[in-house]
Amino acid sequence: MKTRVMYMECKSTGQATIGRVSFSKTGSTLRYRSLEFISLKGSGFKANYLETGSGEQYWISGPRKDGQDRLYASSVPVEIDEDVREEYLREIRGLL
């Protein structure tokens, strides 16, 4: 299964995480930890995936090099999973 470091933001709570996501063969389903997301195929409002367990809408994309991933400014910090922290800072942000 193909994996990639991605930015994930829950649209209802604003909670945001950078972590490793795995893709189905078609790319229409993503998995992160125990969560499964299906593509909204353009039907969501400022969201592109639906978490199948809760029905919550998420914005999931590749993290930006400048670190400005949020759609709207927020005081809630973006969490970075420990298993991808070094890769994110070195390869995506170019900080290490």
Each predicted region: which residue ranges?
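Mixed-charge, low-complexity intrinsically disordered regions
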Residues: M1-R20, T29, L35-L96
